[in-house]
């Protein structure tokens, strides 16, 4: 039996999590009457027509400055030793997925990444948030 993920509020001590103006909460929209399907909303315009591009997986031991970064994209993938400066987690593993939106951007929308969906571990908690990107 498939169970739907339940979104329940969980109180975190935000003083322990580094935040800045480049981060946004993740919003989802329920699709019709299906209790198991939800769409991500664009962090820029709020629409649901998002497409993912590159996926980056960061793997490192706790608090290590260097780790492995695996990048998967349309043309292929590669793994390399990384200083993990783009890792959304300050302490452990992290995942970053680049998204573009059909409604945002100039010219070809697929050339304009609207945000990075980040999954981060911090002191026993797994967080999910949008991170802004510079398209210049």
What is each PLM-predicted segment?
Residues 1-34:
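N-terminal "domain-start" segment
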Residues 58-90:
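Mixed-charge, low-complexity intrinsically disordered segments
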Residues 25-39, 89-95:
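Short, flexible, mixed-charge glycine/proline-rich loop motifs
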Residues 40-45, 101-104:
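Short cysteine-rich clusters marking metal-coordination/redox-active sites
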Residues 48-52, 107-117:
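Short, non-ligating residues that shape and space the ligands of small metal-coordination modules
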Residues 86-93, 104, 108:
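Exposed beta-sheet edge/beta-hairpin loop segments within beta-rich domains
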Residues 64-70, 98-107:
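Cysteine-rich micro-motifs
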Residues 57-69, 117-133:
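Short cysteine/histidine-rich metal-coordination sites, predominantly Zn2+-binding motifs
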């Amino acid at each position: 039996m498939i169970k739907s993920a339940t979104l329940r509020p969980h109180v975190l001590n935000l003083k322990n999590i580094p935040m800045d103006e480049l981060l946004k909460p993740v919003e989802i929209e329920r699709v019709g009457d299906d209790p198991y399907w939800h769409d991500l909303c664009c962090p820029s315009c709020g629409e649901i027509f998002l497409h993912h591009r590159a996926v980056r997986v960061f793997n490192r031991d706790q608090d290590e400055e260097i780790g492995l970064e695996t990048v998967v994209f349309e043309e292929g993938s590669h793994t390399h030793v990384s200083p993990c400066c783009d890792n959304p987690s300050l302490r452990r593993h992290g995942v970053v997925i680049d998204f573009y939106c059909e409604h945002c951007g100039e010219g070809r929308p697929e050339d304009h990444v609207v945000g990075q969906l980040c999954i981060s571990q911090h002191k026993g908690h797994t967080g999910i948030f949008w991170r802004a990107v510079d398209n210049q």
